[in-house]
């Protein structure tokens, strides 16, 4: 599998474009907007879009998913059904944040452990609630790379201080679903630079091993 990222929307959200080098079939993760950039990349690389994937239903990540799938005939899959109320209110969210967005019904709601396929490639689905109830991440075992949306960032973690967020679930998603994939696994976050899970375990001031040990010690004092 090959992949690259295109920044979209004023939030500079990392829209990831993945493709099978044998069949040139492609998948796009989180087309939040600026579809012309995404379509130009696909055309430049001579790729055929088969699959549109969504990590969670916030407008900077999912706002353009329906339009891209309709324009290309690609399947639209994800997120987990826990985000159904957000999927149904994307247009309203978009108006609130001044980001163009359309509601949609996915061709498939995703569950933990599912596989999504394009060309000869497959990604494993990990249900990772915490930033939203239906948030999912995608993992390619062969490339040892994950696409984690807004759960984890380089030296930071996703926001949880809103109606659909939950800090405990966020911590469990990162520590039990992502970090257990292995220290060598690299990841593309929803915003900012790539990193590895091993680096974040050592250096992330919010969720790293030392940070978690301090937090647990403070609770015992």
Q: Which residues fall in each region the model found?
A:
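Active-site HxH/HxHxD metal-binding segment of metal-dependent hydrolases
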Residues: 23, 33-117, 121, 202-214
């Amino acid at each position: 599998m090959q992949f690259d990222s295109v920044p979209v929307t004023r939030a500079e959200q990392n829209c990831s474009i993945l493709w099978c080098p044998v069949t040139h079939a492609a998948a796009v993760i989180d087309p939040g907007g600026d579809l012309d950039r995404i379509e130009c990349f696909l055309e430049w690389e001579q790729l055929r879009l088969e699959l549109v994937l969504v990590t969670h239903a916030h407008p900077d990540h999912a706002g353009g998913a329906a339009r891209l799938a309709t324009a290309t005939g690609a399947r639209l899959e994800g997120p987990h059904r826990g985000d159904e109320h957000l999927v149904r209110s994307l247009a309203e969210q978009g108006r609130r944040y001044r980001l163009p967005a359309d509601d949609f019904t996915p061709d498939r709601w995703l569950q933990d452990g599912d596989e999504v396929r394009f060309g000869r490639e497959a990604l494993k689905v990990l249900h990772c609630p915490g930033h939203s109830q239906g948030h999912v991440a995608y993992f390619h075992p062969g490339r040892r790379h994950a696409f984690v949306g807004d759960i984890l960032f380089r030296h930071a973690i996703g926001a949880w201080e809103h109606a659909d967020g939950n800090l405990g679930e966020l911590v469990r998603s990162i520590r039990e679903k992502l970090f257990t994939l292995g220290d060598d696994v690299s990841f593309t976050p929803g915003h900012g630079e790539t990193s590895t899970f091993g680096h974040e375990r050592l250096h992330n001031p919010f969720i790293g091993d030392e940070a978690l040990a301090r937090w647990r010690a403070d609770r015992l004092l």
